[in-house]
Amino acid sequence: MDIQESMIRSTIQGFSTSYLLYTACELGIFEALFDERKHVTLLAQELSLDEEMLFRFMRPLVALNYMEEENNYFKLLPLGEKLSGQANDSLKDFLLFTGRQAMPYWSKLCEAMKTKKIPYQLVEQQSYFQAQVQQNEKFEVFNNMMSKTSEGLQLEAYFAEKKDWYCIKKIIDVGGGSGEIIAKFLEFYRNAQGVVIDLQHVQQKAEEKLELYGINSRCTFQVGDFFQEIPKSGDLYILSRILHDWEDEAAITILSNIAQSMGRSSALTIIEKLLPEVIEGNASHLYMTDLNIWTMCGGKERTQSQFEALFHQSGLTIKALYPLKEDDYLIEVVKKDFEYQEGIL
């Protein structure tokens, strides 16, 4: 078999590797091996699995360097440790989200392309976000993944360039989920009060997190919908990983609602990934993420010029652009009639 054929075959079978890792996560294998190596017999007993089948299941995990095996004893390697919930930089929640809520709908991609329908809605009777409201299990999986991703967002370099920490008095995080992002902003803007705006089903998780972060005296949760009127009087608004969930018309509605609530000296910080303006070979992961978002909820990742078009139609304009880690960007946006106020931006 030549190299090209081998690469193609490996890609074709990529789905099986994803299901292998997801199944190992669901079975609790990574947790069971996190602290110590174990014999396959003991591991099978602890997990209530057939020993022979478990050994066969573990072999590709060894070959893929997620663990090592010696004399039927298995031990996690660094790649496997990252898929355990005990790891500080764990990808477990992302893997569970992918396995439970993303992978099943990719099988509908061909039909969706032909019918111009969202793959998720070819299977389910409601939209993805309607399911979040009505099905607590789906919300838990999605919220855990988003919380872990937001906690890992590194904003230190951005804050290091800001000189306005004493001027910002009120921060409004629109669609702020459990509050992980606004917690980072309130740590820097020490004189500010915060408000997280999100739907009713998010409230309990958000209030628990705000208390955990020790900012519940400075930050409150307010039930709201970014497709409706947004509270006014914010010096700084946050919109983190929201726009990519929506097609252009809906995204313009969200931005326009925020723009209407902004004062002439207010600013909006948007956190999103940016696609290259031209197709680049090293950006395949971004293009696949773009398709994954469409598969789930009909949204899309965008280029900077596509964002600029949305802002133009919403009465907004880019003030500054800050690269963050792993393809994330922080986009500072202001109203077209922005009026400079000392200390803000």
Briefly describe each language-model feature range.
Residues 1-69, 89, 165-345:
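Alpha-helical subdomain
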Residues 2-37, 45-48, 52-169:
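Conserved Class I S-adenosyl-L-methionine-dependent methyltransferase catalytic core
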